[in-house]
């Protein structure tokens, strides 16, 4: 186990009242958060979203990505479902950090795509470690998940880490002229499924 559960409190939102659960990485002290809605106990699969931190999209309303749109849509879907979890994964910029993300944006402004920009900075296309999220699910006693994602790699990694992903639920929102090339690149080079139906 790479994390410990350290604190929790109620978090009222426009979609309803969530329970905010804080986790801390044992090795680094980095914090992560889960937002839990309703009763997630029991054997039935839980609707969940693993959402990686995106300051620009989540808090600053950037149109360069679909992150903020996905965050809002996921919370809305979870509330409509009546139960579910959003894991807020503190690995900004696909885990290259905020300043390197700004550098990557500058390269994109020069014509590089999101993958090429990461490579120019010496990073892989995606540096995230989703095994931390598997530990968060385990600390919340969740074993079966209906995962809100367009990223099959997330499904694969969480499955390998012991989480039973019984369904992939697409979350296709927020496409606009400013992020169309970015989304097309994620589909073409990173395998994201952006025109798909749920899989079981």
Curated annotation (Swiss-Prot):
Q: Which UniProt keywords apply?
A: GTP-binding, Hydrolase, Metal-binding, Nucleotide-binding, Riboflavin biosynthesis, Zinc
Residues reported to bind GTP: 49-53, 70, 92-94, 114, 149, 154
Alphabetically, the GO molecular function entries are: GTP binding; GTP cyclohydrolase II activity; zinc ion binding
- Known SUPFAM superfamilies for this protein? RibA-like
Pathway this chain belongs to: Cofactor biosynthesis; riboflavin biosynthesis; 5-amino-6-(D-ribitylamino)uracil from GTP: step 1/4
> Which positions bind Zn(2+)?
54, 65, 67
Q: Can you state which reaction this protein catalyses?
A: GTP + 4 H2O = 2,5-diamino-6-hydroxy-4-(5-phosphoribosylamino)-pyrimidine + formate + 2 phosphate + 3 H(+)
The answer to whether keyword Iron applies is no
Q: Which Pfam families match?
A: GTP_cyclohydro2
Q: Which domain of life is it from?
A: Bacteria
List the signal peptide residues: none
User: In the UniProt record, does the keyword Cytoplasm occur?
Assistant: no
- Coiled coil segments of this chain: none
EC number, UniProt record: 3.5.4.25
Q: Which cofactor does it need?
A: Zn(2+)
What binding details are noted for the cofactor?
Binds 1 zinc ion per subunit.
GO BP field: riboflavin biosynthetic process
Q: Where is the active site?
A: 126 (proton acceptor), 128 (nucleophile)
Question: What are its GO cellular component terms?
Answer: cytosol
Q: What does this protein do?
A: Catalyzes the conversion of GTP to 2,5-diamino-6-ribosylamino-4(3H)-pyrimidinone 5'-phosphate (DARP), formate and pyrophosphate.
Q: What family is reported?
A: Belongs to the GTP cyclohydrolase II family.
- Describe its assembly: Homodimer.
Query: Could you tell me what this protein is called?
Result: GTP cyclohydrolase-2
Natural source organism: Klebsiella pneumoniae subsp. pneumoniae (strain ATCC 700721 / MGH 78578)
Question: Which lineage ranks, top first, belong to the organism behind this chain?
Answer: Bacteria, Pseudomonadati, Pseudomonadota, Gammaproteobacteria, Enterobacterales
Q: Quick one: which gene encodes this?
A: ribA
